[in-house]
Amino acid sequence: MSRPFRRITPFLWFDTQAEEAATFYTSIFPNSRITAVTRYSKESSAASGRPEGSVMTAAFELDGEPVTALNGGPIFKFNEALSLVVHCKDQAEIDHYWNKLSEGGDPKAQACGWLKDKYGLSWQICPVDIEALVQNPGSVAALMHMTKIDIAAMRAAAT
């Protein structure tokens, strides 16, 4: 059975940690795997300044969704202008993804369900009904005081 066509694939720029990050992320999410690793050739090494034979890209799937990581050097860094959102069905899932992805990350970057992982990539760990919850002023007020989202507290504040 062939994989469905995906029009959009996140492409993440790392300094030298593309394969390490792919291994880390695929260890956290179900239905995840590294699908390909490419290495810098003599030609691409000369053009990029990256060592010949070192990892250039790591293609992987997170819960079946394609992602590519590039070892492009220190030129570009992740920032909060882009984040990956993980929709969670219950508090146990929120706790799991929050605990795994925040490990080694920046605790100062944790607010309102957002976290920054050890590679500097921002994630939002949210309940599946976050869009409905943030339509309620009580839920939003509760969220403003949270780091990791507490679904029960947000729902209680919505009533």
PLM feature spans:
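Core segments of cupin and vicinal oxygen chelate
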Residues: 2, 12-64
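Short, small/polar residue-rich loop motifs at catalytic or cofactor-binding pockets
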Residues: 7, 54, 108-110
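Vicinal oxygen chelate
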Residues: 14, 18, 28, 61-66, ...
